[in-house]
Regions:
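Membrane-embedded catalytic cores of phosphoryl/pyrophosphoryl-handling enzymes
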Residues: 3, 118-223
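Alpha-helical transmembrane spans of integral membrane proteins, capturing the lipid-embedded, hydrophobic core
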Residues: 14-18, 66, 87, 91-95, ...
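Membrane-helix interface segments
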Residues: 48, 63, 78-83, 148-155
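Alpha-helical transmembrane segments of integral membrane proteins
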Residues: 8-13, 81-90, 152-155, 176, ...
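Aromatic-anchored segments of alpha-helical transmembrane domains
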Residues: 18-23, 92-99, 159-172
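N-terminal transmembrane-helix/juxtamembrane module of multi-pass inner/ER membrane proteins
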Residues: 1-64, 102-126, 218-223
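Membrane-water interface at transmembrane helix exits
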Residues: 37, 53, 73, 98-106, ...
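Interfacial segments of alpha-helical transmembrane regions
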Residues: 9, 68-97
Length: 223
């Protein structure tokens, strides 16, 4: 069970996202975004690190987090299985939220506006704001921090931060795109986790799912 502080923090994060969204939409952060993007994308570019950050940006979202969910469910105890289910629900909500935001608001990606942008991966055609990668990985990291032991959650948080940074490094997002996505991902994760973990219907569904899973394994003579 999560305390009301979890819900309050989630709401605060969502409000902060709305402020970031307004600042970006009205162009208040444009100069900051251009300067910091150029500093990271060009000024901090190191050829020997390009492969690492390209890999992080290409494989750090679904190719990383789907196996995490599967491992938690297959090999974890009851709490880890519960975390896996919460992650699935949070990810579904975040995907829908991200797609809706990108459909309703368009911001050109950096290489379309900045001639000096160094693009290291193919450029998507959808809106730059918010970063879908940051949205998903930070949502996953926050659920992990809430529900898993630190020896698991802290490496997952580190992975999420690396992916967020990589989106600027490879040239596909402005800093505020990433910050907005990360803040929204955290806010939604906190709010949804609070609701689920305090809802008897979720616990009943989870217990039923675990029983069904164990029965299937038993019939297959795997346990």
């Amino acid at each position: 069970m999560q305390t009301k502080n979890t819900l309050l923090l989630g709401i605060i994060f969502i409000i902060v996202f709305l402020v970031i969204f307004a600042l970006v939409a009205y162009g208040v952060t444009a100069s900051f975004d251009d300067s910091v993007f150029t500093f990271i994308n060009s000024g901090l570019n190191v050829n020997s690190l390009n492969f690492f950050f390209i890999a992080a940006t290409n494989y750090g979202r679904e190719y990383f987090w789907i196996p995490v969910v599967m491992l938690l469910w297959l090999f974890g105890k009851k709490n880890e299985k519960r975390a896996a289910l919460v992650l699935v629900i949070v990810f579904i909500i975040l995907i829908i939220t991200g797609e809706a935001l990108k459909y309703g608001y368009y911001r050109a990606r950096p290489p379309l506006s900045l001639s000096n942008a160094l693009l290291l991966v193919p450029l998507d055609s959808d809106s730059s704001f918010p970063s879908g990668h940051a949205l998903i990985v930070m949502g996953g990291a926050v659920v992990s921090l809430l529900m898993l032991r630190k020896r698991y959650s802290l490496p997952l948080l580190t992975e999420a931060l690396v992916v967020c940074y990589s989106r600027i490094y490879v040239g596909v997002h402005y800093p505020m795109d990433v910050l907005g996505g990360a803040v929204l991902g955290a806010g939604v994760a906190l709010t949804v986790a609070y609701i689920l973990l305090n809802a008897s219907i979720f616990e009943s569904f989870f217990n039923s799912l675990v029983r069904t899973y164990n029965e299937v394994l038993h019939r297959m003579h795997l346990i």
